[in-house]
């Protein structure tokens, strides 16, 4: 019985302030002790200004029932960031075979969470196959609609979305300058 429990345990890398791996722990231990770890954040958008928003199930171990402005999740031990992002997008939403853009990393910390986030984005129009034990529903919202309802969203996903929007605005400005 103990061997089966250990085999089903999800292991994650624990990292320091510089995002260097210093240990491994079970996901359960990481949550209980608020250990610093890595996660992926994927902004799924339609390419026309709308963001796919998820409603977290009430059984999630972190911020159940809240809205998420990004897909993604905890990076498993020894897993590459892009590999994790692709795995999470496919598991949560059924998104596979689409290009992912990388937007760098960021740090987020509050009383519930200490995480180094890897930010990605992709364009998808569905249909979406929701992972029933993690995602209870999805809808499309504009960034302005998300901002107006910010108290309903996970704070780490809002930080990821704000960073994506800021980096996207810079890319659009560079493209505009180049075109002139």
UniProtKB/Swiss-Prot annotation:
The enzyme class is hydrolase
Kindly state the positions of the motif Nudix box in this protein.
72-94
User: Which residues are involved in binding Mg(2+)?
Assistant: 88, 92
Q: Which residues form the Nudix hydrolase domain?
A: 35-163
List the EC numbers from the record.
Answer: 3.6.-.-
Query: Keywords on this record?
Result: Hydrolase, Magnesium, Metal-binding
Q: Pfam families per the record?
A: NUDIX
Give the cofactors, semicolon-separated.
Answer: Mg(2+)
Q: Which PROSITE patterns match?
A: NUDIX
SUPFAM superfamilies, per this entry? Nudix
The molecular function GO annotations come to: hydrolase activity, acting on acid anhydrides; metal ion binding
Q: Which family does it belong to?
A: Belongs to the Nudix hydrolase family.
> Record's PANTHER family?
ISOPENTENYL-DIPHOSPHATE DELTA-ISOMERASE
NCBIfam families according to UniProt: PRK15393.1 (NF011922)
Q: What name is this protein filed under?
A: Uncharacterized Nudix hydrolase YfcD
């Amino acid at each position: 019985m103990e061997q089966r429990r250990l085999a089903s345990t999800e292991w994650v890398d624990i990292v320091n302030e510089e995002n260097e791996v210093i240990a491994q722990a079970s996901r359960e231990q990481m949550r209980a002790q608020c250990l610093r770890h890595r996660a992926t954040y994927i902004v799924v958008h339609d390419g026309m200004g709308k963001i796919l928003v998820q409603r977290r199930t009430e059984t999630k171990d972190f911020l159940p029932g809240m809205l998420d402005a990004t897909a993604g999740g905890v990076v498993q031990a020894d897993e590459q960031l892009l590999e994790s992002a692709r795995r999470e997008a496919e598991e949560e939403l059924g998104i596979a075979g689409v290009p992912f853009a990388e937007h760098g990393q960021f740090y987020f910390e509050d009383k519930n969470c200490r995480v180094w986030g890897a930010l990605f984005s992709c364009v998808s129009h569905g249909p979406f196959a929701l992972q029933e034990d993690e995602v209870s529903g999805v809808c499309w919202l504009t960034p302005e609609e998300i901002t107006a309802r910010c108290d309903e969203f996970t704070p780490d996903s809002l930080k990821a979305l704000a960073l994506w929007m800021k980096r996207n605005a810079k890319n659009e400005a560079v493209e505009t300058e180049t075109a002139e």
